């Protein structure tokens, strides 16, 4: 639950900061003429929200590989130092060739919890990394399946897709928050002289409330991408290997997630939530049981 709370607070903090900056630029400098004598200029507001909503997501996307390396301490394998590293590089190269993408960077990060992630702004400029814990606890067949899962994320363009979705929902949040803020300012506070305290306070409050809904939407898309990456893992490595790899993650799922907050949506697993919980709406990954059940229904050739 702490992981989910931190994730939501981070996203909401970003929205609030954008809200404050947006308010200063539009009211003090008149940027975009969002506020006019008759109230909000809806067209200008829509354009400005779209721009501001996408900026943060695009910056995060382009910095994703650099941030991932720093936050996880990933060491890229420039020249394999042992048979294990050589096998990792060769396996990723084989899988990348199978899905027709350029060879990603391959790295290892020091973490006792078995995990892995893929990131990068472009499918041909990606990074695939595995934890030391994964290499120590999984069999070669299971590691192969995990790598295939991550290559699936890269080949499917999941990093770009989630960044675009986050940008779109951020834009909608900012847009509707300001619509409500303007309504409250004019109708409740009877302010006809431009944006007042009612507008700014209401906009920030609505940013927070709508931000929760936006996070749930983004996480729903994230869960769907996990199913697709699992299917790619089954296609490249074999269904039995993929199921075995997911089963091998069960002990780790019972422990708190050790991945940095900004990387949890791109890892192969996240903390487990038993039974129904509101927290399930904010999970970046489906439960292992759901993922394994989907794989059992998978047939070769299925996308």
UniProtKB/Swiss-Prot annotation:
Active-site residue numbers: 150
Binding-site positions, Zn(2+): 149, 153, 226
Subcellular location: Cell inner membrane
CDD domains: M48B_HtpX_like
Main location: membrane
Spans traversing the lipid bilayer: 4-24, 42-62, 157-177, 200-220
GO cellular component: plasma membrane
GO molecular function: metalloendopeptidase activity; zinc ion binding
Enzyme Commission number(s): 3.4.24.-
Pfam families: Peptidase_M48 (PF01435)
GO BP annotations, alphabetical order: proteolysis
Topology of this chain in the membrane: Multi-pass membrane protein
Keywords: Cell inner membrane, Cell membrane, Hydrolase, Membrane, Metal-binding, Metalloprotease, Protease, Transmembrane, Transmembrane helix, Zinc
Cofactors, names only: Zn(2+)
Record's keyword annotation contains Cell membrane: yes
NCBIfam families: PRK05457.1 (NF003965)
Annotated family: Belongs to the peptidase M48B family.
PANTHER family: PROTEASE HTPX
Annotated protein name in UniProt: Protease HtpX
Biological source species: Psychrobacter sp. (strain PRwf-1)
């Amino acid at each position: 639950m702490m992981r989910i709370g931190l994730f939501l607070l981070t996203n909401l903090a970003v929205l609030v900061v954008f809200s404050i900056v947006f308010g200063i630029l539009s009211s003090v400098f008149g940027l975009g003429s969002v506020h006019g004598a008759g109230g909000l200029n809806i067209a200008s507001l829509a354009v400005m929200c779209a721009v501001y909503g996408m900026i943060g997501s695009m910056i995060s996307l382009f910095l994703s590989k650099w941030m991932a390396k720093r936050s996880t301490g990933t060491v890229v394998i420039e020249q394999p130092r042992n048979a294990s590293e050589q096998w990792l590089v060769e396996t990723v190269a084989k899988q990348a060739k199978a899905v027709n993408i350029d060879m990603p960077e391959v790295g290892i990060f020091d973490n006792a919890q078995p995990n892995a992630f893929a990131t990068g702004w472009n499918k041909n400029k990606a990074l695939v990394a595995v934890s030391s814990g994964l290499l120590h606890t999984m069999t070669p067949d299971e590691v192969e399946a995990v790598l295939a899962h991550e290559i699936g994320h890269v080949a499917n363009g999941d990093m770009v897709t989630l960044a675009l979705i986050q940008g779109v929902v951020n834009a909608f949040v900012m847009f509707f928050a300001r619509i409500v803020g303007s309504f409250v300012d004019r109708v409740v506070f009877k302010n006809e002289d431009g944006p007042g305290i009612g507008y700014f306070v209401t906009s920030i409050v609505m940013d927070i409330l709508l931000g929760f809904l936006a996070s749930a939407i983004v996480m729903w898309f994230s869960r769907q991408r996990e199913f697709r990456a699992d299917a790619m893992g089954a296609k490249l490595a074999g269904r039995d290997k993929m199921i075995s790899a997911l089963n091998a993650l069960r002990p780790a799922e019972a422990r708190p997630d050790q991945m940095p907050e900004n990387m949890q949506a791109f890892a192969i697993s996240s903390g487990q939530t038993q039974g129904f919980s509101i927290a399930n709406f904010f999970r970046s990954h489906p439960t292992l049981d759901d993922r394994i059940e989907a794989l059992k229904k998978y047939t070769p050739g299925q996308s």
